[in-house]
């Protein structure tokens, strides 16, 4: 069994921030996603895949992250979700491009918005961005906001 205490701490801090600010953060994320993708904000739902359903490309994520950093006064590290999932994982996050069982467990904890049926054996690390939704970025913003006030 993998020690997920730090990952769980991140999730708990995110949940605490979202307890009082989810709608506010989601509204800003939704607007930023719509602007980046040049679509009507009504088309952005919390769990729609930004890549598979809304047509985002990797360059769009750079623009989105910049907009979110500006809107919330935060810094979002490149590959933030992946880095948090890998932190302290001695067994390795991936092997030959395939996310390990320990890595999948970490992603399930960090990304509760993702249908666990998508995080199964054989999942490739390059597929992680296909999991990203507006809700993923809501949680990412909350993580960075929480880290401003704690050591998470």
What is each stretch, according to the model?
Residues 2-56, 60-66, 70, 74-152:
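Phosphopantetheine-dependent thiolation modules in NRPS/PKS and related acyl-activating systems
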